[in-house]
Design a protein with these regions (language model features):
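Short, solvent-exposed coil/turn linker segments
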Residues: 1, 116, 266-270
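Bacterial N-terminal signal peptides that target proteins for export
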Residues: 1-13
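Functional surface patches built around histidine and acidic residues
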Residues: 2, 25-258, 297-300
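A generic local structural motif
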Residues: 5-6, 138-139, 283
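Sec-dependent N-terminal signal peptides
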Residues: 14-18
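C-terminal motif of bacterial Sec signal peptides marking the signal peptidase cleavage site
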Residues: 20-23
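Acidic, low-complexity Ser/Thr/Gly/Pro-rich repeat segments typical of extracellular/periplasmic
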Residues: 54, 226-318
Length: 318
């Protein structure tokens, strides 16, 4: 089970988990959707050169993996904050005690620390003045790396994790007697936002030159389903701007290196997917799994708040 929550002024994904992944949040406007995911088996998530050193602490490893991926795409890593740690650990303990995965707590239940992520972060003593978010993973694994990577695979969750303006975060973990692990990362900002991206800039994922990218993604296991009526699809490819920017797409394509034919994809933008996709992000999802050990070329042409943006990059599957 994985859950994610975010609050910001313009985009409020609210993803509530039933099985494996979820996200929820707010910050001004509000909206609701849900997300679940089973992705790469843990045994297939291999340690990469330059990756964080495994600590065998779920909270630390999950938090560090999120920062590792953020750094790889050119985003500022989240600064770990002890007050946010307290909020995340309190909620993780609540989930473990009550054997569930959810963003909202019910007053009166054992371990109650606050109804919503915002309440819990504020109660910890952290003064939120801008954005907040929450990621929760619950799965029978002891790998924080794996839990965080699952969230990044799920496209609606990735949109939030790779928000450029997040500033600080904290994490907590717990494991029950059956070996079922819970991992929570809370993200927030005060004194406005993090540095974000320069005006008119974007980041992409998979990033240019990335290797060992997964070939497929189980769309049915993320709710809302990003590719309705189809389960196994190709690995999602995404473009991200600051949340207060407007990203428009003129062309967004992917093809096997050396091929003259673009893959058939589903495009996610604010105009094609208005409920679940923010105005600052876009993604394409190939409608068939990618080939193993194959390089793919991606092209994006569009605008960020009216400024022309063109990107061409490649990645290679495992």
């Amino acid at each position: 089970l994985i859950a994610l929550s975010l609050r910001w002024k313009h985009y409020v994904p609210a993803l509530l988990a039933a099985v494996l992944l979820s996200a929820c949040g707010g910050g001004g406007d509000s909206g609701n959707n849900a997300a679940q995911l089973t992705s790469t088996p843990a045994g297939q998530l291999t340690q990469e050169p330059g990756a964080p050193v495994l600590s065998n602490n779920i909270a630390t490893d999950g938090f560090n993996w999120i920062n590792y991926r953020r750094s790889q795409v050119g985003l500022a890593p989240l600064v770990r904050n002890s007050l946010i740690d307290s909020a995340a650990q309190g909620h993780t303990s609540y989930l473990n005690i009550n054997n569930l995965v959810a963003h909202e707590q019910i007053q009166g239940k054992p371990g109650f620390t606050g109804v919503a992520p915002y309440d819990r972060i504020i109660k910890s003593g952290y003064a939120i003045t801008s954005v907040w978010g929450e990621v929760i993973a619950g799965v029978a694994t002891n790998s924080g790396f794996y839990m965080a990577e699952n969230l990044i695979t799920a496209i609606y969750h990735r949109f939030v994790i790779f928000e450029p303006l997040f500033k600080e975060g904290g994490a907590g973990s717990a494991v029950n007697s059956s070996g079922y692990a819970y991992f929570t990362t809370d993200l927030a900002g005060n004194s406005r936002y993090g540095l974000g991206l320069p005006t008119g800039q974007v980041i992409t994922y998979p990033f240019n030159g990335q290797v060992k990218v997964a070939t497929s993604f189980s769309s049915n296991e993320e709710t809302p389903d990003p590719v309705p009526n189809q389960d196994v699809v190709g690995y999602p490819i995404s473009v991200h701007a600051n949340f207060d920017a407007t990203l428009s797409v003129t062309a967004f394509t992917v093809r096997q290196h050396g091929s003259g034919t673009d893959l058939t994809v589903r495009l996610l933008t604010k105009s094609t997917d208005p409920i679940n996709t923010a105005r600052s992000v876009a993604a394409i999802i190939p409608l068939a799994p990618l080939l193993a050990n194959t390089t793919y070329d991606v092209s994006f042409i569009g605008k960020v708040s009216g400024a022309d943006v063109t990107r061409s990059w490649s990645f290679t599957t495992r």
